[in-house]
C-alpha cells in the first residue's frame, strides 16, 4: 500500500466497502457492540473478505484520534479519484455540474459540501489550494462516505481555472446575496460551475469578476444568509430539478 488513510465511522467505511473493498487493509471494530447496525456491518465486511480486528474503545480512540468513531475505524489505501481537472472533464458524459468553493476552510463545512455534491450528482468539488482545507479525518467523517466518491480538486489559481472552464464551454455561475437575478430564473441545464463563497465573506473580488453571471437565493425569513453547505444544496438541486424536467410535447 503506497499511501494510506484512516476511515472513521460507519458511513465512511461502508462507502469504501461498496466502492472498493480491496483497497481496505484492515478494519478495527468495537468488540463489545452487539447491536443490529454493527452486526450488519460485520457481515458485509466479512463477505468482502476484509481483515477484521476486534478492539476496545480505548484502542479505537487512539487509532482514530477522536471519541467520535462509532466503533468502526479502517486503514485503507488513499484513492485518487481524478488526476486533474482536464482528465475529469474529458471523462464526463453529458453537461458537467461542478461545485466551486472559494474560501471554505472549515472541515465540517467541506465535509457537508462533499455530501451534498454526492447527493446531487455533481462531478467534482474544486477549491483553491491557499484558501481551502484538505480531506482530513473530520472532513471524511462529516462527508459520510462522499469523500470516497466525489473528486476534490485543488488548484493554484482559481480565477485562471474558472477562465479555463469557460474556454471549455462551462458557464460559471457565482452566488451573491445582492445579485439581482433569482436562482430560480437562472438556466442550469447546460455545463455549469457553481461558485460558492465563504459564509459571511462571499467570493473574493477576482473570483466574482470572473463569473459569467451572479444569482441570489430568495430569502423569505429574517436570516440574511445560509450555511455554505445548505446554500450549495439549494443551488445544486435546482440544477438537478431543471435537468430532470421533461419538456412538454
Swiss-Prot record:
Subcellular location(s) of the protein: Cytoplasm
Entry superkingdom: Bacteria
Gene3D superfamilies listed in its UniProt record: 3.30.1330.30, 3.40.1280.10
Any GO CC annotation of this UniProt entry: cytosol
Residues annotated as binding S-adenosyl-L-methionine: 197, 217, 226
UniProt catalytic activity: guanosine(2251) in 23S rRNA + S-adenosyl-L-methionine = 2'-O-methylguanosine(2251) in 23S rRNA + S-adenosyl-L-homocysteine + H(+)
Annotated InterPro entries: 23S_rRNA_MeTrfase_RlmB, Alpha/beta_knot_MTases, Ribosomal_eL30-like_sf, rRNA_MeTrfase_TrmH, SpoU_MeTrfase, SpoU_subst-bd, tRNA_m1G_MTases_N
EC number assigned by the record: 2.1.1.185
SMART domains found in the cross-reference section: SpoU_sub_bind (SM00967)
Keywords: Cytoplasm, Methyltransferase, rRNA processing, S-adenosyl-L-methionine, Transferase
SUPFAM superfamilies xref list: alpha/beta knot (SSF75217), L30e-like (SSF55315)
GO molecular function, one term: RNA binding
Pfam family, one: SpoU_sub_bind
Similarity-based family: Belongs to the class IV-like SAM-binding methyltransferase superfamily. RNA methyltransferase TrmH family. RlmB subfamily.
Function noted in UniProt: Specifically methylates the ribose of guanosine 2251 in 23S rRNA.
Entry-linked PANTHER family: 23S RRNA (GUANOSINE-2'-O-)-METHYLTRANSFERASE RLMB
Identification of the protein by name: 23S rRNA (guanosine-2'-O-)-methyltransferase RlmB
Species, as recorded: Ralstonia nicotianae (strain ATCC BAA-1114 / GMI1000) (Ralstonia solanacearum)
